[in-house]
Every structure is written in C-alpha cells, then in structure tokens.
Amino acid sequence: MRLFLVYFVILNILFSISAMAEKPYHHVYENGKFKKFRNYQGAPERNKNFKWSYKKFREAKKNINVIVPKDFVVPRKTVLENLEKYKNEDFILWINHASFIIKLGSTTIVTDLITAPNAGPLFLGPRRYTPPALELDQLPKIDLWLNSHLHYDHLSISDIRNFPYKSAKVLVPLNNGSYFKKNNFKDIKELDWFDTVQINKDLSITLTPSQHWNKRSALPFGPGATDKALWGSFLIDYKDIKIFFACDTGYSNIYKMMGKKFDGI
C-alpha cells in the first residue's frame, strides 16, 4: 500500500511538471497554480520611471484648455446617411477611440465598443470631449464583437448591458468573457494568442499578442485583477484582405514575429 502511494505521489509530481512545461511563456504559474499573464517572451519590461512620467503628464494636463475645432466632429446626420448609402458594401466606420464598425461581406463587426459618457466605474473616470459617431440604438445589426482587453476605455459595462444585438458572437482573450456572460450574451469564445476562429468560408479571426497589460478592479482576485485576464490584438483575414486591429500596444519583438508568421499582414 505504501509503495502504491509513493508511486501515486511521484506520478502526480511528474504530471504537474509536464503540464506546466507545456504552458506558453505568457502563462505564469506558481506552485502549480495559475498566477497571471505576461507579455510575449523577449518583450521589454515597463520602465520603472513610467509612473513618475505619467504623474507629470496628468499634472500638466490640468493646465491645458482643450478646445475641439468646430468642424472636427462629423455630424451624426452625415454618419447615418453614409451608413445607409454604403450598407451593401464593405466599409470601416470609426465610432471613437478604438471602436470601429467593420463590414466584410455578410458579417458586421464591432471592436472595443464604448459609447458611454465616461471611461470608468459608474460616473468616475475621464469624460468625453466629443460624442460617439453613433449611439447604441443607431448601430447596424452587429454579428461579431471583438474585445481586446478590460480597461475602462475599451470595455463599457453600460454598453454591454444595453447592447441591442445579444445574439452576436463575442471573441475575447482568455478570462475576459464573464463580463459578457453576466449580461446575457450566449455565444462567447475566449481565445489564447494565435487561436483562430473561422467565422465563415471567407472570414477568420486570430487573436495575436500585444505589448500591454490588463486590469479592471482594485481587488487582488477575479478576472479584473491585474493581469489575471489576457489582452491582445486581432488579425481579421477576409478573402485577400488582412486588417490588423492592434488596439493598445507598445512596440516590441512581436511585430517582426507576426510579420513572418502572417504573410501579407
């Protein structure tokens, strides 16, 4: 019996070591348990002076009087007219920040949708200087939602909650899906870097690395904790067209790698 237990313990240890060895570099484990995600192997670490420089930027920003030029924003009427005019063609429409509508054949995609008045929890966080090109109730029918990470300027709970097309397919990096699931989205797929989803015979989506990080909550646990959920960019491959939605990223070795891996990007 003792001999059996010894063999059992040894096999468990060997299995755990083997399983950990198979994990990608960006999956960090500690004592056999998942700890966090990290950037692509060989990517630079964040400079220790970043917080200091960001603090100085925020202080200086308070003294800047932001004036939006009169003709800077395309009138909503023009946006809606063009949406109707080109509804049977492929197009890309910029809503704001990282929010785009991309129509490719019969599939209409939205990326990192945010139309909320502020980027933060409840009423907190930076507020808009300009309105979005479209409000939620003015969006065309969306078939596919791509979301890159959980930062408040890329994921809006009010937009998820009030989104009119809950039947849309949602593609997100690992551990990002719960925010959609809680708000009645049914078709949610979490991806690791380099996972590809075939949407139809002409369209595929691949999650690719980005040089960034993830956080949504001050709590040390759950998907909103620092780097507990993965982040990424998306490669949209449609017929002979490639669209790279880089989203939030710094420069690193990932771009040379992806240039070699994905011909024609």
Q: In which residue ranges do the predicted regions lie?
A:
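Positively charged n-region of N-terminal signal peptides that target proteins for export
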Residues: 1-4
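Bacterial N-terminal signal peptides
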Residues: 7-15
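Metallo-beta-lactamase
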Residues: 17-138, 236-247, 263-264
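Active-site metal-binding loops of divalent metal-dependent hydrolases
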Residues: 113-115, 150, 210-211, 247-249
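Active-site metal-binding motif and surrounding structural segment of the metallo-beta-lactamase
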Residues: 124-172, 187, 260-265
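Active-site-proximal loop/helix segments of hydrolase catalytic cores
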Residues: 158, 214-265
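Short, polar loop motifs at secondary-structure junctions
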Residues: 173-179, 192-194
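Flexible, acidic/histidine-containing loops and adjacent segments that form or flank the divalent-metal
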Residues: 189-191, 196-227, 239
